[in-house]
Amino acid sequence: DAVILPGTKNTISDLLWMRQNGLEARILKHSAQNKPVFGICGGYQMLGMEISDPTGEEYGGTVQGMGLLDTKTVFRPEKHRTRVHGTFGEMKGILKEMEGLPFEGYEIHMGKTELLEGCPMNQIHDTVKKKDRQIPDMEPENRIENSTDGISHGNVYGTYIHGIFDKEKIVSEIVKSLAEKKGLSMEEVEGVDLKAFKESQYDLLADTLRKHLDMKAIYQIMGMQK
């Protein structure tokens, strides 16, 4: 029903592997049937027209992308790290109901992706809040600015933001849109609050550790009084 290309530390190598093994052809066929394709980080880079690695950060040279988005990516030595909060801008295609929904996540990548001149694609301009030191080694910035976090064209979507599907409302809208395309009714879809789920799992882990470890001895080793 939908293809999500996730991030990777080996964008070019993985793209060539997918090309050699027929996966790229299947993704292109899927997109030609007007079914959604969503690329995240390295997956976003793969969806473009070209990926260039002039300084040999990963593979070296230039390779052709899948050609589903009119973008070009150039790898650079500097790694971009930042946490972002924003809102989906203008969305087209099957995910148009996501327009205006808030999201949060983080970026960590070594490439810069630019929209090719003269292409008719919709850029997703969002207000992004970059918080200071939310993840180790992230950019020490604390400001609000307008930024292009992704690009959509028809039913093809790309973004550098990891965690963009973590919010329950976003997941629900995606499931509803996919169901409606198949003629199914999903009016009462209830998603899972991922943040609350993670907290409950952390609590279970903490309870298990307290049950099976000598916590008093551990606190003494740490120099803490408990």
PLM feature segments, named:
Residues 15-18, 119-123, 147, 170-176:
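Composition- and surface-driven signal marking solvent-exposed, interaction-prone regions
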Residues 33, 46-53, 71-75, 114, ...:
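Short, well-ordered loop/turn and helix-capping segments at boundaries between secondary-structure elements
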Residues 147-226:
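Acyltransferase
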Residues 37, 68, 105-107, 150, ...:
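Conserved beta-strand scaffold positions in the cores of enzyme catalytic domains, especially
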Residues 36, 43, 84-89, 111, ...:
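A glycine-rich phosphate-binding loop feature that marks nucleotide/adenosyl-phosphate handling sites
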Residues 2-5:
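Terminal amphipathic helices with adjacent charged low-complexity linkers/tails
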Residues 91-154:
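Catalytic beta-strand/loop cores that center a nucleophilic Ser/Cys/Thr
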Residues 8-94, 99-104:
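Cysteine-nucleophile active-site neighborhood
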